[in-house]
């Protein structure tokens, strides 16, 4: 699958860029106000008790700031953070090596925690509850269990699939925080801040236009801003103006709802070739040349959220709203 401008996952070349934009304190973090308010209380209370923060589960769509929040938690608690991904912890020994290296109060951030193997997850349970590990050494008759005491720590788990977590793992998190899509006002503020970091000016209309097309996701907003800045610099404009913004977004094929050419391809397939549906997911996948899981995990959620697509027992179906939007878009292109 080619990388899309509106893909909410991080592109391979964006790591350093995203790091440069990330706030380091709660007061700098834009949006997610309910989460910020709760975290301020939880962190202050933990520090007053001289205890680690309870284990925290962050969940929601990609690109909304789960990794950023994990680092902010460590900064606010004034401790170190160790970051790993769920799939990288293949054996109990991998987890034991990391946990035994933590200092009291440290944060362990596990991204994609829903992808932990079952054997690693079972070893994690006593570590989360009672701060010890039971490790089996040897095989067969010579196998024996060794208990390793751990310093108190905070586990921050992040997932885009909270429903895929097992009940025992989910229940061991004392704090559950769901990140929501950002409103246009917060995205506009993020875009203006990013433009300052990039050293470029941007007019108000452009910031609003980019916010509208960013799919409620700061990562998408920053990516679109970078590409619009390319057009501004080639045009030798003193700042980003609305005319350049609309021209650039048109060439990038990102419409006013944040939908790109793949979204249009999928919806036109359902509307034109299958009379609006219902049509099976496998049929759509074959018709547009994409994998079923990619459609289900990457393309569908936003189309459903915007009210253009409906899941039914018989397959996917275009909504009346979709007919209006995509018919108009097709007329404008013709």
UniProtKB/Swiss-Prot annotation:
A Gene Ontology molecular function term of the record: ATP hydrolysis activity
Region feature (Small ATPAse domain (RuvB-S)): 183-253
Record's catalysed reaction(s): ATP + H2O = ADP + phosphate + H(+)
Location in or out of the cell: Cytoplasm
InterPro entries linked: AAA+_ATPase (IPR003593), AAA_lid_4 (IPR041445), DNA_helicase_Holl-junc_RuvB (IPR004605), P-loop_NTPase (IPR027417), RuvB-like_N (IPR008824), RuvB_C (IPR008823), WH-like_DNA-bd_sf (IPR036388), WH_DNA-bd_sf (IPR036390)
A Gene Ontology biological process term: DNA repair
Top-level EC class as recorded in UniProt: hydrolase
Keywords, sorted A to Z: ATP-binding, Cytoplasm, DNA damage, DNA recombination, DNA repair, DNA-binding, Hydrolase, Nucleotide-binding
Chain residues that bind DNA: 292, 311, 316
Enzyme Commission code(s) on record: 3.6.4.-
Listed Pfam families: AAA_lid_4, RuvB_C, RuvB_N
Classification via PANTHER family: HOLLIDAY JUNCTION BRANCH MIGRATION COMPLEX SUBUNIT RUVB (PTHR42848:SF1), PTHR42848
Notes on the domains: Has 3 domains, the large (RuvB-L) and small ATPase (RuvB-S) domains and the C-terminal head (RuvB-H) domain. The head domain binds DNA, while the ATPase domains jointly bind ATP, ADP or are empty depending on the state of the subunit in the translocation cycle. During a single DNA translocation step the structure of each domain remains the same, but their relative positions change.
NCBIfam families to which the protein is assigned, alphabetical: PRK00080.1, ruvB
Purpose: The RuvA-RuvB-RuvC complex processes Holliday junction (HJ) DNA during genetic recombination and DNA repair, while the RuvA-RuvB complex plays an important role in the rescue of blocked DNA replication forks via replication fork reversal (RFR). RuvA specifically binds to HJ cruciform DNA, conferring on it an open structure. The RuvB hexamer acts as an ATP-dependent pump, pulling dsDNA into and through the RuvAB complex. RuvB forms 2 homohexamers on either side of HJ DNA bound by 1 or 2 RuvA tetramers; 4 subunits per hexamer contact DNA at a time.
Self-association and partners: Homohexamer. Forms an RuvA(8)-RuvB(12)-Holliday junction (HJ) complex. HJ DNA is sandwiched between 2 RuvA tetramers; dsDNA enters through RuvA and exits via RuvB. An RuvB hexamer assembles on each DNA strand where it exits the tetramer. Each RuvB hexamer is contacted by two RuvA subunits (via domain III) on 2 adjacent RuvB subunits; this complex drives branch migration. In the full resolvosome a probable DNA-RuvA(4)-RuvB(12)-RuvC(2) complex forms which resolves the HJ.
Name of the protein: Holliday junction branch migration complex subunit RuvB
């Amino acid at each position: 699958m080619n990388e899309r401008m509106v893909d909410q996952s991080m592109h391979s070349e964006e790591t350093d860029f995203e790091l440069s934009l990330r706030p380091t304190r709660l007061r700098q973090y834009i949006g997610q106000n309910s989460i910020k308010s709760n975290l301020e209380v939880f962190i202050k209370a933990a520090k007053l008790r001289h205890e680690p923060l309870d284990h925290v589960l962050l969940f929601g769509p990609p690109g909304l700031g789960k990794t950023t929040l994990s680092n902010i938690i460590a900064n606010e608690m004034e401790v170190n953070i160790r970051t790993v991904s769920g799939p990288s912890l293949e054996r109990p020994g991998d987890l034991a090596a990391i946990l035994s290296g933590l200092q009291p109060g440290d944060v362990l951030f596990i991204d994609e925690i829903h992808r932990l193997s079952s054997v690693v997850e079972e070893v994690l349970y006593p570590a989360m509850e009672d701060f010890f590990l039971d490790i089996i050494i040897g095989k067969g008759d010579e196998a024996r269990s060794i208990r390793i005491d751990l310093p108190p720590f905070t586990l921050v788990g992040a997932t885009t699939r909270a429903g895929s977590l097992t009940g025992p793992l989910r229940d061991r998190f004392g704090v559950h925080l769901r990140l929501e899509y950002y409103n246009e006002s917060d995205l506009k503020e993020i875009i203006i801040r990013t433009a300052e970091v990039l050293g470029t000016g941007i007019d108000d209309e452009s910031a609003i236009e980019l916010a509208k097309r960013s799919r409620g996701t700061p990562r998408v907003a920053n990516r679109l801003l970078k590409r619009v800045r390319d057009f501004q610099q080639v045009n030798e404009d003193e700042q980003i103006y609305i005319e350049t913004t609309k021209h650039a977004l048109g060439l990038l094929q990102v419409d006013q709802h944040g939908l790109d050419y793949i979204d249009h391809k999928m919806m036109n397939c359902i509307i034109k070739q299958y009379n609006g549906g219902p049509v099976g997911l496998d049929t759509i996948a074959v018709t547009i040349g994409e994998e079923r899981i990619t459609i289900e995990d990457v393309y569908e959620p936003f189309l459903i959220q915007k009210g253009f697509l409906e899941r039914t027992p018989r397959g996917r179906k275009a909504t009346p709203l979709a007919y209006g939007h995509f018919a108009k878009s097709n007329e404008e292109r013709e």
